[in-house]
Amino acid sequence: MLYFDAHACIGQRPQKHKRTRWSTEHLLEDMQLAELSGALVSHALAHSFDPIYGNDRLIQEIGKAPDRLFPVWCILPLGSVDFYSREREMLGAMEEADVRAVRLVRGNYSLHEAVMGDTFAALEEAQILTLLSMGWAGEDPFAFFHELLDRHPRLPVLLTDHVWSQQRHVHRLMQLHENLHIEFSAYQINRGIESYAAEFGDERLVFGTGGTEKSPGAARTYIDYAQLSAESKERIAGGNLRRLLRGQGPLIEASEGGAEDRCIAEARRGIPQSTFVFDAHAHVLPEGKQGAGPNYIMLGGDAAGMVEVNHWCGIDRIAMMSWHGPVCTDAEDGNEVVWRAMQRYGDEIVGVAVMDPTHMNDSDIRAEIDLRYREQGFVGLKPYVHMNLSYEDVGFMPWWAFGDAHRLYALMHVAPHTGGVAGVGRLAERFPNMSWIIAHAGGSYAFAEEVASCIVEHPNVYAELTLTPVTNRVVEFLVEATDDEHVLFGTDAPMRDPRQQLGWVLWADLPMASKEKVLGLNFKRIVDRALRP
């Protein structure tokens, strides 16, 4: 299948972590690893400095691979002193450079009609694909983009950088505006690609990676395992973008590499993984629920829906806590939802219980410990930041002591007020028989470095990966900085779809033996060592 990335950026950028990939060479290496045929690319200097200067640099850079890299220019309002004064100048320069897409970078100017009306009208008349980041929208994304799209109904717009929590805005915009297209690099919504293709057709869905900062393998796996026809997947993977660019794009499918890598061989063909896969971080909604209040939609977010998606891609087992138990601090009822799922699906689901000292007294916690761990066989412990306590608070100590006595594990989402990573290190020393898993360790290089240092000092601490940024090459970094036995695959499903998180590991530049450990064997070892009370 021919993959053509609609959302990539190269070039020097401010405030970059030293490990973050940025160059044209990095992008081409990542494309080769993930078997992408082409990419629509902007230059970071056109984002942070002068658009014309940065666009000129872009043309030089894409000359390194003209059959694989295609330009998207950053623009300003026509008539700006530092930009083209008239539409024929801008469009003429674009035609000369064969530029068929533009991006409006958020900055100190407005997209109001009085500022951008002439520019949008010129782009609309010329049918230029226009990339707009969700960052423009402020607090009311629907109102902002609804007005803009309503004013220019024939302007082909590709929305980028929207996230799973903005579904209510994006979905309604898609319902109302046929000129709106979306990509899924950060919009990792559970069952989203199938749902949107069914409701809106696949023609407005586009493959984007967020490269060079996001993992391209994560993005493509959402399509590889999509429950859609081969023809539909081909349109989303690259055909739709080529159409929007009026035929511009790569002509040849990327060559297949990693012949000896079973994970990649199965993923590229949409075959469920035969490698053992164990999700170390997931939530669940009550039966039949599709969301979590005014903020979040989680399509098919109950246990039945989650298990079905897992089977599509080959996730064998899942460690599950409720959503409303930790996030809404409704611990006991949330634990009961998990228990019902455990009864229905047996060993496929490992129970993770929540205790909340802000709503439960010591006797409540002791009773809940006896019920969930002694009687029902839960293995995981999940405190949460919304309890507004340090994890070293005295209210947690009976729970930690029980976990230590029975070699259970805790999944720790840390924040400054919980004690941070250092606090987990102190708990790991105090309760050495427990396994302490730090959640979201792959969210950034800065956090990954902090977690890796803690693991080196405390061998009973582990790094669980999941987070929306799917930071490019951070899986490899964590394995290198620790070893391949302290890094764990997780998804945070159904808040996020599990497939991008799975692809982050499947397409990592790691030997097959290391992938097997990260995908499931490491977490299985943690669960298996627990002494069931």
Where are these regions (language model features)?
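Conserved, mostly hydrophobic/aromatic
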Residues: 7, 31, 58, 94, ...
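Active-site beta-loop-alpha junctions enriched in small/polar residues
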Residues: 9-11, 15, 44-46, 74-78, ...
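Active-site gating/metal-coordination segments in enzymes
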Residues: 37-38, 48, 52-131, 251, ...
